């Protein structure tokens, strides 16, 4: 989705000049207006595992944590074609932060649990 505010809570993708495939991805660092929703698909499980292991071996962390999105950079370096499916920002609801989850719960009119602040 396009995040015109470029909120650094998301992952971002920069497309190649033809706007066909990902040229680079970044976690928590806006490199374009295209943010990801945190749902990833890997055509090959072994590609995911090998790229993940390489990321871990390189200690490629963000905020001292490993994330899934940067795995794609390792696949891009191997000339793998990484595509995106763009959705409208109004068709997704982030739930990656406590505030996002509370907003989503309010939107869906879910009852508040005892553990949630009121």
Residues covered by each model-derived region:
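Conserved alpha/beta core of the MobA/IspD/sugar-nucleotide pyrophosphorylase nucleotidyltransferase superfamily
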Residues: 34-118
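Conserved core of the sugar-phosphate nucleotidyltransferase
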Residues: 1-59
């Amino acid at each position: 989705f396009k995040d015109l505010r470029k909120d650094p809570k998301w992952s971002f993708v920069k497309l190649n000049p033809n706007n066909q495939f990902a040229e680079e991805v970044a976690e928590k660092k806006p490199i374009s207006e295209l943010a990801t929703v945190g749902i990833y698909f890997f055509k090959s499980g072994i590609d995911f595992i090998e790229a993940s292991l390489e990321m871990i071996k390189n200690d490629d962390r963000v905020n001292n944590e490993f994330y899934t999105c940067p795995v794609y950079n390792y696949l891009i370096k191997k000339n793998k074609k990484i595509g995106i499916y763009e959705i409208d920002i109004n068709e997704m609801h982030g739930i990656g932060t406590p505030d996002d989850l509370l907003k989503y719960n309010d939107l869906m009119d879910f009852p508040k649990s005892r553990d949630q602040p009121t």
